[in-house]
Amino acid sequence: MFTQYVVVKLKAKAAPEFTRLIEREVIPMLRKQKGFLDEITFISPDLTEAVGNSFWETKADAEAYNRTAYAEVMKCLATVVVGTPTVGTANVSNSTFHKIAAAQTA
């Protein structure tokens, strides 16, 4: 399993709309992508920053999403996000939620 995380700065008072857009616009787009498994989104306590973690079957699936749908997702969020997102990737080594063990990624 592979994950991509995106860190964004939120516009003032935009957290509720950000959450709505993730639920109603972004997650349906992600579900259409090959290899998509899950999305978990966090918002900082002061409501100024959000982190989205998308989970993919393979690194290739995440890379394909980046080439095809990532720009559309960010366009959808343009009304609530400021600045350039920080993007990173990682192999998932453990997850109680997804029931995987480190041996599966070794």
Where are these regions (language model features)?
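Short S/T/G/P-rich N-terminal loop/turn motif that feeds into the first structured element of a domain
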Residues: 1-51, 55-71, 79-106
